[in-house]
């Protein structure tokens, strides 16, 4: 009997490890929330908030998982496409940028929505609309910034730690066996070779050219190619500086942007709406819908990258990111 009990104890542990109970609610579909106003037409406000990536956030105890910004925009734009009352779209941006591809995909989705839906799209930069955030803003017909907003930071960045010296100090040595000379390209365990640095710079230059092309194509009336090149050294601009340099179309408050969009539509009344997950969310035009993908602490670029939220897998992360 004693032997049987000893046998059952590890068996129970094995069976327990096979049982998984989810105590976080499932992600619910987006629901429309009226922020303000009245009337038949709707002006939809969508938030691009925090670092732009393909990574969402798993739910904790009693909280829903949160899709990535890319997934959120796709879901929201599909929902808006089928609503015949949507008369205009405002992308409210508060982002330092993020992944190159994630930024480009959101830009593409908004551009495709605008062409198919045939409604005006405004980008409103609330606090920060830098690098990838500014890239996404190029999908809009008009870019407006809050008087105290920061924008710009046109460029590409890629970073790594070189920990070879640290490993040597603690007596740890890494060995790599590879099929080709560049298989461990950009490894943190050794300094990069001149050839590798040149290869990486070539990739960055190509992605930078893409950024320049997108801005050039969408800011034809405000910027010449030579003017844009002079501004595209990675620096940020205040709203006033951005307006003077042709990077934005207007410096105004959000209420003014909404009024301006109504005027362009030839209407005086409209419901301003957003899409959010069901919650105790109390809506105003300044409320961020409760589906943030990054916490306040994670909004600074380096923390997000090295905490794994932007680049969860090994490799080089190419970023359209303002990273002070």
Regions found by a protein language model. Name each.
Residues 2-9, 13-129, 140-146, 158-324:
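N-terminal organellar transit peptides
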Residues 130-131, 150-154:
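Short gly/pro/ser/thr-enriched loop/turn and capping motifs at secondary-structure boundaries
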């Amino acid at each position: 009997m004693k032997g049987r009990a000893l046998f059952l104890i590890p068996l129970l542990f094995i069976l327990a490890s096979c049982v998984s109970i989810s105590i976080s609610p499932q992600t619910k579909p987006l629901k429309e929330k009226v922020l303000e106003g009245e009337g038949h037409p709707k002006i939809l406000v969508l938030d691009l908030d925090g670092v732009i990536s393909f990574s969402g956030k798993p739910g904790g105890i009693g909280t829903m998982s949160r899709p990535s910004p890319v997934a959120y925009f796709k879901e929201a734009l599909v929902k808006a496409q089928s609503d015949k009352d949507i008369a205009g779209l405002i992308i409210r941006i508060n982002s330092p940028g993020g992944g190159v591809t994630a930024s480009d995909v959101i830009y593409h989705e908004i551009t495709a929505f605008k062409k198919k839906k045939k409604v005006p799209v405004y980008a409103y930069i609330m606090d920060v609309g830098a690098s990838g955030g500014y890239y996404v803003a190029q999908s809009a017909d008009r870019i407006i910034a809050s008087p105290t907003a920061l924008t710009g930071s046109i460029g590409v960045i890629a970073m790594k730690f070189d920990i070879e010296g640290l490993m040597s100090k603690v007596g740890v040595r890494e060995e790599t066996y590879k099929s080709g000379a560049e298989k461990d390209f950009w490894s943190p365990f050794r300094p990069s070779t001149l050839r590798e640095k040149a290869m990486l710079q070539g990739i960055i230059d190509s992605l930078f050219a893409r950024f320049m092309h997108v801005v050039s194509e969408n800011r034809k009336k405000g910027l010449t190619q030579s003017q844009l090149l002079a501004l595209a050294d990675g620096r940020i601009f205040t709203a006033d500086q951005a307006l003077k340099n042709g990077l934005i179309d207007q410096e105004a408050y959000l209420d003014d942007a909404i009024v301006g969009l109504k005027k362009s539509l030839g209407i005086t009344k409209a419901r301003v709406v957003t899409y959010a997950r069901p919650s105790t969310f109390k809506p105003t035009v300044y409320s961020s819908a409760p589906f943030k993908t990054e916490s306040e602490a994670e909004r600074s670029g380096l923390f997000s990258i090295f905490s794994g939220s932007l680049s969860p897998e090994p490799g080089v992360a190419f970023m359209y990111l303002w990273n002070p």
